């Protein structure tokens, strides 16, 4: 019963950012995937990690249009990135969509994601709407909270990939996709989770999935906790 209640609450939250309308047959993209990044996982497998941005929450990696065959849209023609398009909600962008790479500023990261994926959605979502939608999409649910309710915590424990996916599916009524990378010890570390909605963003749908990520039957993926680093400004542990 609680799961049904949670799904209902999430659907209401989803409707807040839905652009609605009828599905457009002339529009090549059938769904959108919000790619969420786990900062501690990213930083464990990337040397050029900006430790200032480590948070115990998932941050936005990107918003990707997919066609009906499950192929993401890449590098379409369209307008150039304009930072003024996010000026009204710039502070929220820095918090929710930060770059975790030391050599990439937040604005550079947004520009890259717009060029790589965002422009492909421009017939439906103009630049400002694209970024607003990603922010609202992220706020429609709490991945960490949903996982915690199913006994999955970012505490460096090992979990089967299917267990993580089933935990999220229980609450969103749709299958997510997870991504993981090997660290220097050849352990699989969770770095990203995709959550998908239909073209009009009125309901969650199953994400395109790579069967290989489901069928690491003898493998486990580790969900790192927030790592501790010395803050050079205060020499204290953060």
UniProtKB/Swiss-Prot annotation:
Source taxon at top rank: Eukaryota
One of the GO BP terms on file: RNA catabolic process
MF GO annotations: nutrient reservoir activity; ribonuclease T2 activity; RNA binding
Segment forming the signal sequence: 1-23
Distribution of this protein across tissues and organs: Root.
Entry keyword set: Disulfide bond, Signal, Storage protein
InterPro entries listed in its UniProt record: Ribonuclease_T2_eukaryotic (IPR033697), RNase_T2-like (IPR001568), RNase_T2-like_sf (IPR036430), RNase_T2_His_AS_1 (IPR018188), RNase_T2_His_AS_2 (IPR033130)
Subunit architecture: Homodimer.
Record's function text: May act as a storage protein providing a nitrogen source. Seems to have no RNase activity although it has conserved the active site residues.
Family of this protein: Belongs to the RNase T2 family.
Name assigned to this protein: Ribonuclease-like storage protein
């Amino acid at each position: 019963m609680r799961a049904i209640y949670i799904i209902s609450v999430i659907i209401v939250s989803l409707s807040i950012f839905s652009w609605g309308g009828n599905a457009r047959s002339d529009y090549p993209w059938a769904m959108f995937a919000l790619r969420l990044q786990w900062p501690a996982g990213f930083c464990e497998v990337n040397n050029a990690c900006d430790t200032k941005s480590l948070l115990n929450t998932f941050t936005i990696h990107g918003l990707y249009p997919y066609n009906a065959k499950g192929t993401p849209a890449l590098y379409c023609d369209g307008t150039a990135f304009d930072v003024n398009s996010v000026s009204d909600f710039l502070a929220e962008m820095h918090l929710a969509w930060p770059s975790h790479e030391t050599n990439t500023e937040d604005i550079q990261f947004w520009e890259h994601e717009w060029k790589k994926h965002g422009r492909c959605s421009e017939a439906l979502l103009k630049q400002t709407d694209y970024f607003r939608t990603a922010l609202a999409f992220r706020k429609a649910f709490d991945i960490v909270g949903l996982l915690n309710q199913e006994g999955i915590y970012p505490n460096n424990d090992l979990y089967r990939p299917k267990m993580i996916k089933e935990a999220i599916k229980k609450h969103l009524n749709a299958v997510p996709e997870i991504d993981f990378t090997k660290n220097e010890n050849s352990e699989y570390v969770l770095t990203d989770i995709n959550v998908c909605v239909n073209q009009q963003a009125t309901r969650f749908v199953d994400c395109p999935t790579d069967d290989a990520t489901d069928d690491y039957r003898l493998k486990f993926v580790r969900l790192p906790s927030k790592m501790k680093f010395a803050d050079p400004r205060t020499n204290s542990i953060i």
